Amino acid sequence: MSKKFAEYSQFDLSKVNKDVLKKWDENQVFAKSMTEREGCPSFVFFEGPPSANGMPGIHHVMARSIKDIFCRYKTMKGYQVKRKAGWDTHGLPVELGVEKSLGITKEDIGKTISVAEYNAHCRQDVMKFTKEWEDLTHKMGYWVDMKHPYITYDNRYIETLWWLLKQLYKKGLLYKGYTIQPYSPAAGTGLSSHELNQPGCYRDVKDTTVVAQFKMKNPKPEMAQWGTPYFLAWTTTPWTLPSNTALCVGPKIDYVAVQSYNAYTGQPITVVLAKALLNAHFNPKAAELKLEDYKAGDKLVPFKVIAEYKGPDLVGMEYEQLIPWVNPGEGAFRVILGDYVTTEDGTGIVHIAPTFGADDAQVAKAAGIPPLQLVNKKGELRPMVDLTGKFYTLDELDEDFIKQRVNVDLYKEYAGRFVKNAYDPNLSDQDESLDVSICMMMKVNNQAFKIEKHVHNYPHCWRTDKPVLYYPLDSWFIRSTACKERMIELNKTINWKPESTGTGRFGKWLENLNDWNLSRSRYWGTPLPIWRTEDNSDEKCIESVEELYNEIEKSVAAGYMQSNPYKDKGFVPGEYNEENYNKIDLHRPYVDDIILVSKDGKPMKREADLIDVWFDSGAMPYAQIHYPFENKELLDSHQVYPADFIAEGVDQTRGWFFTLHAIATMVFDSVSYKAVISNGLVLDKNGNKMSKRLGNAVDPFSTIEQYGSDPLRWYMITNSSPWDNLKFDVDGIEEVRRKFFGTLYNTYSFFALYANVDGFEYKEADLPMNERPEIDRWILSVLNTLVKEVDTCYNEYEPTKAGRLISDFVNDNLSNWYVRLNRKRFWGGGFTQDKLSAYQTLYTCLETVAKLMAPIAPFYADRLYSDLIGVTGRDNVVSVHLAKFPEYNEKMVDKELEAQMQMAQDVTSMVLALRRKVNIKVRQPLQCIMIPVVDEVQKAHIEAVKALIMSEVNVKEIKFVDGAAGVLVKKVKCDFKKLGPKFGKQMKAVAAAVAEMSQEAIAELEKNGKYTFDLGGAEAVIESADVEIFSEDIPGWLVANEGKLTVALEVTVTDELRREGIARELVNRIQNIRKSSGFEITDKIKLTLSKNPQTDDAVNEYNSYICNQVLGTSLTLADEVKDGTELNFDDFSLFVNVVKE
């Protein structure tokens, strides 16, 4: 019994999704995709680890689809593509989530909850949504090994991190420093520069700013002649003014002394500021006013410039402490030089608070300016603001320090206040901020020259969304700047998609690289493996658990530890299995309890910091295989490293992409990835960021349930390039489902229907190309061109182009052209060679399309492929994803034939558009198309497909006319946007010349693509792209132009043409009745039609034609037709009775 191609009663891609998933699972197709490629060249892919403590979103479908496409493609190209899933399990997001769920803050850890209990919650919480992630990954068809993922909290993973840190340590690239660093009070930890540069971290905020008046101690004589002399300095952070210890001027900046008044108090003042910024602070209209005429409250405040200075002229001048709450000691309150001072804004004089700015600290230190520091109860030096973001309270300070250095009466009013309302749980943005309070105090004290709201760009914590402070921290750093040039050099070898990200966003980041702040003052993360003596005389960096085990043994012998906790738990050094490593925990607090012994017998405690969680993910190429403790040869021999391809969102440019690159460069002097796609954001259809709060987030689970994964993936990939932002619109998914998948489904259904009727199973040998009709040779030529182009697109990481090429082929060439033109070949009786050629050709197209689309639309591609080979047995694989990617066959390509058929499609499209313009249906024959040919090549192409064009557009003849014959009058119109910049003042003369072009000149322009004018001895060359060529309609004709092609359609309908049109319309209506009546395609029928003067002549003349077309044995006209179907035409109706014989 012959096999039948599957026929479906409905088109349901959601069901296809589920059926194919079941098949994959039952047949272990993903596993086979790797095992069946054993011994083949490897294509290395790294999966960036997501965090499972949050639900996956629609943007994850986009990111994972991009990864899946190229892994599937490379598998089909014969590579072995192993892809290991991973989980990012440490860090701030996890900790903040746990704190929120437990209702605690960082300060509660170690007090109301132990570190061990807290970290146990983190370990549990971080995997909270693992099932949802696995479910989405499964349903969307992303093949990645989730049964054996790498997990960053795993002890073996951490061991590799320690080994990497030790390599950096041995190279002198790991050091400890006390510097000003970005610090998040809300998170309670320092941040690295790449964290600070995550998208959206810098945002515009409106803050209260002040131009402060710093009273001079030793003014120059001319400065003391009018009122009180001051230096003016502007700040956007008034809360830092109590910590001011210096003012900074630029070495090449010109400054002026200005006599005027304070606008708030009306007191006379002489102020110094940059000359270039004079008009920013004094109204030029007041320059002519006399100082003595000013009255307090006048809108215009008079001013007078009395002297000019260079920056160095002001250096060394002293001033009184602005806000004397705390005495910083000797050497403060002087004017110093700084190269970074500019006149872009402010006053050209910078207020220096060394404890709250990196530049401030640097210039102050160089000039011997002390920072303003407090002494706490422990005797430690601290900045005025504590780690929670508030001024220290008096209770928290050393009593002796308070007596000697603190003005309690002034300070107590502000002690304990948060410097930003965002840090205070009891305040909102509407409450008065500390900045405002300080500014108001300064205003009353005649210390504020100008107070105003100012919008500026300010950094925020990437996880808490709250403002960041620049704060002095004891931190461990990676000296990444030492390898900056090598990072830049290696980056140039990476294939970035888009290229602009590599040269721009990423490249510029590398050029401005800072050292990597590795320290994090948190609890749940990878502990820094450095132990130090209390006096910092000795330190050890541990690179493995075995080394730590041995060092503990020495500590036990020295009496610092009672026993070795790892030995107690049965841990065996050198045994790398999971069971052995699960006996221990390298996290806090257990690792903190380990005391080591120095060379000279002193106890050593671990540095309390954790490491930046971005180091965790950046180390995954090595840690996922427990390098170098296991799989050393695999990595060293480049079998699993570097990655051939990675992909993540654009927000990872300065995150995962950077840390991968940095670690690889510094430790291995290598790239860690050869090619990378940086995909854009998924926004809502209006271009807004999606969020649950705004209600515009799209649920990926329900979307896949409704539409299936394939339309979602295809829409996301073909709508815009992966690196562009996608404005996500659910309507687009439905359009893709209908236009592409629906068309492909209908094409397959057509094939299956007739192949089953004729028993076609592709058991016959392939017909040679020269024995196939021209239309078959054409579609196979176009198919092979498609194979070549799609293969190139996938290989060059251009999935959008690949998907669009496949869509265009299916819609325009396969369905709308080949199948439509060849329907009769499949309908015909008998099994001729012509019919065999049609079946083989259409089958080949469908099978090839299934393979080409498989990387993007894995489900329907597999269903289509399986439905085809399940009957023909032309391949012995269980899934399209185990098949080989189609190979380009140059011998089957005929570019001349493709050009001819393209001409047929172009002419047909233009003529059909003209028909729609006057509402003449295609079934209504028309007499003539007139085409003014540009050259002999164009004419030859049209001649070759002349009959096909006439059939497609239903015209009786095609006439060729000389382009200059005057039958069709063409005109040219200038595109001034293009020609204007090109010709400038000549444009008017050029436009006049273009308007006067002869028909011969226009023909030459069309033929050559350009034309040269003589403008009074000067040549002017225009190109066809610079102008619009159009033809005027002539009576009874419609004209259309596209590029070099012009067609004119005669739209006059004669009586003869009208009768033929009616016959064709009746055929169409009767065919629809056959279909709706459920007749088989082979059933013959008898027809009775009611008489009507509008149609009788046509029926009599075309009786045989109508019967032949609808398989009618007879067609009779009757005065009355009972039980007939009514057929409605534009201005009449009639009845027809259709009876099956």
UniProtKB/Swiss-Prot annotation:
This is Isoleucine--tRNA ligase. It comes from Bacteroides fragilis (strain ATCC 25285 / DSM 2151 / CCUG 4856 / JCM 11019 / LMG 10263 / NCTC 9343 / Onslow / VPI 2553 / EN-2). PANTHER family: ISOLEUCINE--TRNA LIGASE, CYTOPLASMIC (PTHR42780:SF1), SOLEUCYL-TRNA SYNTHETASE (PTHR42780). Its EC number is 6.1.1.5. Its cofactor is Zn(2+). ATP binds at K692. SUPFAM superfamilies: Anticodon-binding domain of a subclass of class I aminoacyl-tRNA synthetases, Nucleotidylyl transferase, ValRS/IleRS/LeuRS editing domain. Keywords: Aminoacyl-tRNA synthetase, ATP-binding, Cytoplasm, Ligase, Metal-binding, Nucleotide-binding, Protein biosynthesis, Zinc. HAMAP family: Ile_tRNA_synth_type2.
